[in-house]
Regions:
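Sec-dependent signal peptide cleavage junction
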Residues: 15-34, 500-501, 525-530
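Acidic, polar low-complexity linker/tail segments
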Residues: 24-71, 78-84, 488-490, 494
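Short, charged loop segments at secondary-structure junctions
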Residues: 80, 114-152, 157-160, 177-180, ...
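A surface/secretory-pathway sequence property marking extracellular, secreted
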Residues: 106-108, 122, 126, 345-394
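Von Willebrand factor A/integrin I-like adhesion domains
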Residues: 130-134, 167-173, 229-362
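Low-complexity, intrinsically disordered segments enriched in Ser/Thr together with acidic residues
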Residues: 390-453
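C-terminal membrane-anchoring or membrane-association module
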Residues: 518-534
Length: 534
């Protein structure tokens, strides 16, 4: 009988997931007031016994806390109309808090010659809504220090380390006209500068007020110095780097000329109080943008042409409506955004496994050939989301047909399966969060060894103000598995017995002898039987 020995070593499956939240994947390009980045993540589950993994795309990131900060920095002269729009945004945020159970913190700064914290950054509740509304309506007078207002707002946002930077919003409402500034981030004490009265054709010193600009430039009440706001701001920055700027000229604002004549500006090329105030305001605004905060500049009213132009410059060269800000605070991306996802070369997408949820609600779907519709009537003319699969390329396009809420992540899941027969040995690299490091280590992932569930997944976002954002790449989860080979061994060969001729002959002789005796006995027995019968 043939013996077959089969040995099987145990299989060990290891898989990783990868997640990239907005802000953790670096993006190139200048920070702008528009769509800067979009929170997003992509994860994969551990391979099961059939070498399958569930991949999940999420907008915003599934790992992100659904908490936001909103700080209003309001000019003392903010109109009642804009205050009402701010209150409408506040009411909508209150609905999100009530309906979705999310956390939104709100702060209010009112500024004149200094910044006044009318309401510290506090979690929005039904109980404090009225108090916040009163803070927004608060009126004060005397002075205009935009730098102070932004410093106070920035401090609020900086101090809250529990909220992701891109979920921090600063809404700056001003006419852009300013002539006071602060030193060493102290937003409670205003400073100014003043030209020597001899430079003023009218004679008297202007006491560090807005009128100092009239000493420096002619016709400034109806025009922009240097021909445009961009030229002027560039010129100011250049002079700030020369001896046309000196901190010794700064003095605490009192409404009077400096008591020390050495502080008086003697040259019209010197950086004036208005110019330094504008420069520091813009620098603080940009610093917040570079920190990832979403800053929104809204023109409160038109007083001076250069003030209006300055606010539009902060807003990216365009006027910003309060309604568009409200949309940005509430939503991550708008209708028309798409995701193009290509499955990894080592995997195949498993048909019929798409699943989509909004918040905690799983949407109904209908599959029509290679197209799957989610939500609405689930057809080509009425759907919330659509997925079109390309079998030849093993890729799909996800179309988003509604704004995606910052407070209710949209998650698309599907299953991939390892293509072909698992090869013996260890393959892939564990990278559960897609940060480029092997899980639970500080070791960089070797991309040549990674086993990516996807070749790529690209988000092409539409901003909430309708603008087209730059393409953003999702992370690529990498998985790992270890499989043993099957071993087969031939059965042992039969033992061949060698019989010598002598032994063989003796054996035959014995056999013949025994046979002969047996035969003789049989004959004898037969004879006896025959006689008895007779």
């Amino acid at each position: 009988m043939r013996r077959i020995s089969c040995f099987l070593l145990m299989l060990t499956l290891l898989l990783t997931t990868a997640v990239v939240a907005w802000g953790t994947v670096p993006t190139d390009g200048e920070v702008t007031p528009g769509l800067v980045n979009v929170s997003r993540s992509k994860t994969a589950t551990v391979l099961d016994k059939d070498y399958r993994s569930t991949v999940t795309l999420s907008l915003p990131s599934a790992e992100e806390k659904l908490a936001s900060d909103v700080v209003f920095v309001l000019d003392k002269s903010t109109s009642a109309e804009l205050e009402d729009k701010a209150l409408k945004l506040l009411a909508d945020l209150q609905k999100e808090v009530t309906n979705r159970g999310v956390m939104v913190k709100v702060g209010v700064v009112i500024f004149n010659q200094a910044a006044n914290v009318a309401f510290p950054l506090t979690e929005l509740t039904e109980g404090n809504y009225a108090t916040i509304a009163d803070a927004i309506r608060e009126t004060i007078s005397n002075g205009s220090n935009t730098h102070a207002g932004l410093l106070a707002g920035k401090e609020m946002l900086d101090d809250d380390t529990a909220v992701e930077p891109h979920r921090k919003h600063l809404i700056f409402v001003s006419d852009g006209v300013t002539y006071q500034f602060c030193k060493e981030d102290d937003y409670t004490t205003p400073y100014t500068r003043s030209f020597d009265g001899s430079l003023n054709s009218d004679g008297p010193n202007q006491c560090g007020t807005l009128s100092e600009l009239n000493v420096q430039y002619e016709g400034v009440e109806t025009s922009i110095p240097k021909g445009s706001i961009d030229n002027w701001m560039s010129d100011i920055a250049g002079r700030m780097r020369t001896d046309n700027d000196n901190e010794d000229w700064d003095y605490q604002y009192t409404g009077q000329a400096p008591t020390d004549n050495s502080k008086l500006l003697k040259n019209k090329e010197n950086v004036s109080n208005v110019e330094k105030a504008l420069h520091l305001t813009e620098s603080t605004y940009k610093a917040m943008q570079e920190s990832g905060y979403q800053c929104h500049a809204v023109l409160a009213r038109e007083i001076r042409q250069w003030g209006t132009a300055f606010m539009n410059r902060l807003a990216g060269g365009r006027a910003v409506a309060f309604d568009s800000i409200q949309h940005k605070v509430l939503y991550a991306v708008d209708k028309g955004s798409t995701v193009a996802d290509t499955v990894g070369k080592s995997f195949d997408l498993v048909p019929g496994t798409f699943c989509l949820t909004v918040g905690v609600q799983e949407l109904q779907y209908k599959q029509d050939g290679n197209v799957t519709y989610f939500g609405g009537d689930q057809n080509e003319s009425n759907y919330r989301f659509k997925i079109e699969y390309d079998g030849a390329a093993d890729s799909f396009t996800w179309e988003i047909n509604e704004p995606v809420s910052n407070f209710a992540p949209v998650k698309l899941s599907y299953t991939v399966k390892l293509a072909g027969t698992p090869a013996a040995g260890t393959h892939g690299v564990m990278d559960l969060n897609g940060d480029g490091y092997v899980d639970d280590t500080t070791t960089h992932v070797d991309v040549s060894k990674a086993l990516y569930t996807n070749e790529s997944a690209i988000l092409t976002p539409v901003a909430t103000d309708g603008g087209q954002g730059e393409a953003l790449e999702f992370p690529k989860p990498s998985v790992s598995y270890t499989a043993a080979a099957y071993y087969y061994s031939e059965p042992p060969a039969p033992v061949k017995r060698t019989v010598s001729p002598t032994t063989f002959d003796a054996g035959i002789a014995v056999y013949v002898e025994v046979a002969a005796l047996s035969l003789a006995g049989a004959v004898k027995l037969c004879g006896r039987r025959g006689r008895r019968d007779a």
